[in-house]
Amino acid sequence: MELYQGVVLGVLQGLTEFLPVSSSGHLVLGQNFFGITEPALSFDISVHLGTLFAVALVFFKEIKAMVVSLGRLVQNLGSLKNFKQVVKADGDVRLAALIIVGSIPTAVIGLILKNYVHALFSSLVIVGSMLMVTGTFLWLTRHSTPGGKKVEQIGFGTALFIGVCQGVAVIPGISRSGATIAAGLFSGVERETAARYSFLLSMPAIAGAEILSLKESFATGAGFDTVTLLSTLTAFIVGTLALVALLKIVKKGRFYLFAPYCWVVGLISIIAGFVA
């Protein structure tokens, strides 16, 4: 892979990991454009680490607050009379619990689909079709009733539902952020809270996938070169900017504006797939 190709793919990963247009779908399109049939596993791991660090940077305060609250909870566990009440009343503990609950269906679905999804990355028709699906549920958020649920009002059933949507987003062309934020909005969650939860929920999913991929990478002896490292840095910088921008867009209720883009790119992908 040439240096400029790695940088372009890093930009694509950084932008599309958080914007609701499917990072996996766009990486497939980018790889097809450059004629890269099978990118190095170490490259895939690295660019995803770049976007994981972007989430950690943007939500550092929230992550720190959750860690502190959970630490305090563990220290006082023996003296707590009503554990459930504490989880419900403490917003930081509640958020951590919701992330854990939401991560369960994501992990189960991801492990089940892992071997089947790999083959889909070579199909422009499937990627394009799933982008059309992504565009449709993004557009439907325009008609969702604005909810007011904050973290303390989100039920574990809602967390499971959002986690299922995140798991399904392993299919290339289905946007993870689009699916999870839309699921939150349809469930009556307040816009900014839905976005915050979506991106914090992505951290265990990305980290878990990275651990599995690293194990495979070490087994194959894959290494990390200059192109890979520069792509990672690019994904981190662009991802941070994209994440901050999307939070503002969701807060203003303009999430649906990404739908036409998904439809256009999806249609082009389907046509290109049939022509090829």
Curated annotation (Swiss-Prot):
Record's subcellular location: Cell inner membrane
Chemical reaction(s) catalysed: di-trans,octa-cis-undecaprenyl diphosphate + H2O = di-trans,octa-cis-undecaprenyl phosphate + phosphate + H(+)
A GO MF term: undecaprenyl-diphosphatase activity
Membrane topology designation: Multi-pass membrane protein
Class in the EC hierarchy, top level: hydrolase
Pfam families: BacA
EC number, UniProt record: 3.6.1.27
Predominant cellular place of this UniProt entry's protein: membrane
Gene Ontology CC terms: plasma membrane
Additional information: Bacitracin is thought to be involved in the inhibition of peptidoglycan synthesis by sequestering undecaprenyl diphosphate, thereby reducing the pool of lipid carrier available.
Free-text function comment from the UniProt entry: Catalyzes the dephosphorylation of undecaprenyl diphosphate (UPP). Confers resistance to bacitracin.
Family according to the record: Belongs to the UppP family.
Protein name per UniProt: Undecaprenyl-diphosphatase
Annotated organism of origin: Desulforapulum autotrophicum (strain ATCC 43914 / DSM 3382 / VKM B-1955 / HRM2)
